[in-house]
Amino acid sequence: MKKKVQEIVNTVFVGDSRDVLKDYPDKCVDLCITSPPYWGLRDYGVDNQIGLELERDEYIGELVRVFDEVHRILKDDGTMFLNLGDSYSGSTGRSGGISEINSKARQLKTGAYKDLRPSKVDGVPPQSLMQIPSRVAIALQYSSGWIIRSKIIWSKTNPMPESVDNRPTKSHETIFFLSKIPTGYYYNQEAMSEPAKNPNSGDPWWQRKLYGEPSRHGLDGAAASGAGNFRTGELRNMRTVITLPTNSYKGAHFATFPPKLISPFIKGCSREGGIVLDPFMGSGTVAEVSKKLGRLYTGVELNKEYHKLINERTSQMEMFI
């Protein structure tokens, strides 16, 4: 029997999202923000968990099962922000996709790092980027008819180092913005806006230093600090590249979604009092930020130890509202 809406709000269920979401009522959530487990990099000690599939396409198929359910329980004017990591075929270490969110944030006693991927993947040359995010997005188009409205790049200013000497270090993550309908979904453009860059100001100091300027000599105060790069009070439509550092939570020993990354998504794509879903809740950042912004949250997490952390984060946050 399907649960009632009041039974899912401000609740994180311990279990497998493929099973738990089946009990959610149709069209009950307004927004989904999530980051699924990496393929083959984590073992939580639970049979048939997502991420331990022997084949890449099987992994993609299991994610499709989850997001078919998300499509069903999302309201017609709802949307989803899906953060996905990639892998290299034949590699034997972290591949640098959702490094902070999955290589760290999903590391507890039952989830220590392991590379469980096969050394070869059919149809993919060794050491090739497998394009898993794009493959998943395309599969979602054909399964439930998800509409890919945008591909957002989160450019990290503090990426995890990689021991590679034959390719650039991965310093970004992919976030797909998807909807159920082509137009008419809820989207508050003002809430999704960002400060407008001032073309008349100089490059900020860090950019000058990056491209060879050795000092701040000759720069005015605004240019030296970078503050002059934005017009006070003027906004522009959000760009598809978001530059932010990773974030850490004082109650955990890992990095998480930066609240600044997902706050505009929650404010811009859900109304106050709306329900925000995360079927792979992890450390609970989506729940915490949703509650702080006056939304309800709901979600699923496989690891029982994370459930304790999520409850701690949301209860501590209440003291500051």
PLM features per residue range, with description:
Residues K2-M319:
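Core catalytic lobe of class I
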